[in-house]
Amino acid sequence: MAAATGTRKKKTPRPGQWKLWLLYTAGFVPAVWTFYLGATGQLGADPVKTFEHLLGLWALRFLILTLLVTPMRDLTGITLLRYRRALGLLAFYYALMHFTTYMVLDQGLNLSAIITDIVRRPFITIGMISLALLVPLALTSNNWSIRKLGRRWSSLHKLVYIAIAGSAVHFLMSVKSWPAEPVIYAAIVAALLLWRLARPYLRTRKPALRPRGEAIALRK
């Protein structure tokens, strides 16, 4: 007799799925640690500002790591494409926490104070625009959106370049003087964006290195 139909196949976890969950877990460690420092009074004289700053800094760091995936593959042959989505989402989560801290803890959801602050300090507007650009990218960072949007998905996700540029400018403008830290981050972002612009020309002149682990399908 034929085997009974209608039995559902059990979904088996994709190879390396545990590495993604490990990345997410490790990615949230800085947020948990910073919250712990704030809760125990170890964030200095202005804990809210320090908490807000550190969350924003980690958002920028994860954006940089997201953009580093492609040059690393081009220059070394090491491919980390399967982790790029997770890095991008971590950047968005930290940017959202940074924004929430500003709105709730810093400004106390006082709309008039927020508007006054935006007018007085334009870098806040730049930061909010950068976050707004990340929202559609986070919402479409899934396989269903890739299938539905087709080629438009790639075009949409190019907004990340504007978002990371805005984030670097936001950081630079948020300090009264230009200490080394924001300048270094801005220089890294500028280098990554220049690499992206020059990449099509570099690829025509030099064959790309064969990525390690190329046999593993990258498209999900």
UniProtKB/Swiss-Prot annotation:
Key word Ribonucleoprotein present in the record?
no
The membrane spanning regions, by residue number, are 20-40, 51-71, 86-106, 122-142, 153-173, 175-195
Listed name of the protein:
Protein-methionine-sulfoxide reductase heme-binding subunit MsrQ
Which Gene Ontology CC terms are recorded?
plasma membrane
Q: What family is reported?
A: Belongs to the MsrQ family.
Instruction: Enumerate the Gene Ontology biological process terms.
Output: protein repair
- Subunit note: Heterodimer of a catalytic subunit (MsrP) and a heme-binding subunit (MsrQ).
Cofactor binding annotation: Binds 1 FMN per subunit. Binds 1 heme b (iron(II)-protoporphyrin IX) group per subunit.
Q: Tell me what topology the record assigns in the membrane.
A: Multi-pass membrane protein
**Cofactor needs:** FMN; heme b
Which InterPro entries does the entry mention? Fe3_Rdtase_TM_dom, MsrQ-like
Q: What is its main location?
A: membrane
Q: What role does it play?
A: Part of the MsrPQ system that repairs oxidized periplasmic proteins containing methionine sulfoxide residues (Met-O), using respiratory chain electrons. Thus protects these proteins from oxidative-stress damage caused by reactive species of oxygen and chlorine generated by the host defense mechanisms. MsrPQ is essential for the maintenance of envelope integrity under bleach stress, rescuing a wide series of structurally unrelated periplasmic proteins from methionine oxidation.
Q: Which UniProt keywords apply?
A: Cell inner membrane, Cell membrane, Electron transport, Flavoprotein, FMN, Heme, Iron, Membrane, Metal-binding, Transmembrane, Transmembrane helix, Transport
Question: Where does the UniProt annotation locate this protein?
Answer: Cell inner membrane
- Show the GO MF annotations: electron transfer activity; FMN binding; heme binding; metal ion binding; oxidoreductase activity, acting on diphenols and related substances as donors
